[in-house]
């Protein structure tokens, strides 16, 4: 059975998006689906984000027999603005993903990513294939980001 590690930009629950639809329609693969991180500042802005600070410590959930969903650990904010922060965050996430891969006996995986920030992660997670499923223009979201940096990470990721 094929092994897929999916680093998503939207959580599996509560509202299914295209990412969940794609993964749920691959029946001949075992999938580790990782919900996105929250930043350490997120709960200050939105109290509903507070559980995101510790969700990564929970056991994985199984929305389907072949899919296990985990939450990624929280990250430092401003990763869309400062590359050095993104690199720190991605190293932390890569360690977490590698640990879950070991726990599930995952080798020779297809790494499936949705965010340009993973440009700093993909070389840290062993994989035999890479899919960058570009569904949004991330640099157009606005907010606390450097659009030039986000576009540069996206180009780097697309070239891997």
Label the predicted regions:
Residues 43-44, 139-148:
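Short, charged, surface-exposed secondary-structure boundary motifs
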Residues 95-102, 146-160:
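Membrane-proximal helix-turn-helix segments that form the acceptor-binding/catalytic region
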Residues 1-55:
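N-terminal subdomain of nucleotide-sugar transferases
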Residues 3, 108-110, 129:
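Structural motif
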Residues 93-94, 110-126:
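An aromatic- and histidine-rich active-site surface loop
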Residues 25-27, 123-126, 157-159:
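Short, conserved loop/helix-junction motifs that constitute active-site signature segments
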Residues 41-106:
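A conserved catalytic-core segment of Leloir-type glycosyltransferases
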Residues 30-32, 112, 123-140:
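Active-site proximal beta-strand in glycosyltransferases
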């Amino acid at each position: 059975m094929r092994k897929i590690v999916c680093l998503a930009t939207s959580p599996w629950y509560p509202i299914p998006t295209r990412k969940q639809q794609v993964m749920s329609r691959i029946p001949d693969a075992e999938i580790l689906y990782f919900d996105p991180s929250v930043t350490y500042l997120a709960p200050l802005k939105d109290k509903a984000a507070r559980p995101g600070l510790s969700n990564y410590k929970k056991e994985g959930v199984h929305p389907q027999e072949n899919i296990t969903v985990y939450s990624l650990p929280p990250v430092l904010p401003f990763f869309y603005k400062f590359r050095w922060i993104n690199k720190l965050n991605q190293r932390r996430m890569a360690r977490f993903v590698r640990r879950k891969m070991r726990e599930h006996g995952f080798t020779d995986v297809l790494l499936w990513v949705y965010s340009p920030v993973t440009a700093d992660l993909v070389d840290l997670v062993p994989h035999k294939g890479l899919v960058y499923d570009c569904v949004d223009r991330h640099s157009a979201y606005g907010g606390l980001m450097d659009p030039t940096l986000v576009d540069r990470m996206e180009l780097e990721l697309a070239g891997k």
